[in-house]
Amino acid sequence: MATTTAPSRQLTQKEADIQMMLAADVHLGTKNCNFQMERYIFKRRNDGIYIINLGKTWDKLNLAARIIVAIENSQDIIVQSARPYGQRAVLKFAQYTGAHAIAGRHTPGTFTNQLQTSFSEPRLLILTDPRTDHQPIKEAALGNIPTIAFCDTDSPMNYVDIGIPANNKGKHSIGCLFWLLARMVLQMRGTIRPGLKWDVMVDLFFYREPEEAKQPEEDEVAAPDYAIADFNVSAIPSDGQWPAAIDQPWNDAVPQPIPAVPAVNWAAPEAVAGDWGEAVPPPQQIPTAGIESVPATGWE
């Protein structure tokens, strides 16, 4: 009996994104679980690691993208990451979506102290880790700023309005999440047509070691040229015969000898220009003819 193979079905956008998240270890949680994150847990492995339901992760990413698109001015959105693995992803996300990025340590009072030069009042705050970025979350709560954060299984959910369940500790996971969120935002804005592949690779959102960034720069530096200089070897005939000018006499080319230094009699007495014992003549007085004496003013 002949067996017929079913044609390969093309994956939907959601299925392709979930496969990418699986490859980036977005589904791996921690050994601890917050009670508010239990609804996003798929199962628990034998080693104690909680597995996150990526279907709910994709739905939360879609919801967060809709909220970002609803804000007219992109500069009113602040995306922030104090974790080193998320700083490059934050900068790339801000580059493609037009948001304002804060990569590094948060300055206390940025959202509450109006006397600071870096004071700002955003309409939306996007964070990488609620535990690491606890200071901006508290300030956003005081200023009634909605907050979107990537939450791991052990992340606190206090003052987080939209928590996206995902692994927020891996460099590949964070880069993949920000890449998916940026692509969804651009698709909803109409910059990217739905169903078409985004020409920006996800690797650009990944964290890079400082040594890896310096290596291409060192390779681009041109090595010094230590090759032997060209001394016009082509001028020498290939038949081995030297030109006739070499056979000419060389007498005229010999330089004249340097004349000898005249002999000096060092025993002769040294001639003295004058007698040092003579008296020095007295100084001569300069005539003051024509110069009138200045009358006394009485100030002395």
Curated annotation (Swiss-Prot):
GO cellular component: cytosolic small ribosomal subunit
Subcellular location: Cytoplasm
Coiled coil: none
Family: Belongs to the universal ribosomal protein uS2 family.
Keywords: Cytoplasm, Ribonucleoprotein, Ribosomal protein
Gene Ontology biological-process entries: ribosomal small subunit assembly; translation
PANTHER family in alphabetical order: 40S RIBOSOMAL PROTEIN SA
Positions of region (Disordered): 275-300
A molecular function (GO) term: structural constituent of ribosome
Organism: Cicer arietinum
Main location (coarse class): cytoplasm
Protein name in the entry: Small ribosomal subunit protein uS2
Cystine crosslinks: none
SUBUNIT field: Component of the small ribosomal subunit. Mature ribosomes consist of a small (40S) and a large (60S) subunit. The 40S subunit contains about 33 different proteins and 1 molecule of RNA (18S). The 60S subunit contains about 49 different proteins and 3 molecules of RNA (25S, 5.8S and 5S). Interacts with ribosomal protein S21.
Record-linked InterPro entries: Ribosomal_uS2, Ribosomal_uS2_CS, Ribosomal_uS2_euk, Ribosomal_uS2_euk/arc, Ribosomal_uS2_flav_dom_sf
Pfam families listed in its UniProt record: Ribosomal_S2
Function (record text): Required for the assembly and/or stability of the 40S ribosomal subunit. Required for the processing of the 20S rRNA-precursor to mature 18S rRNA in a late step of the maturation of 40S ribosomal subunits.
Superkingdom of source: Eukaryota
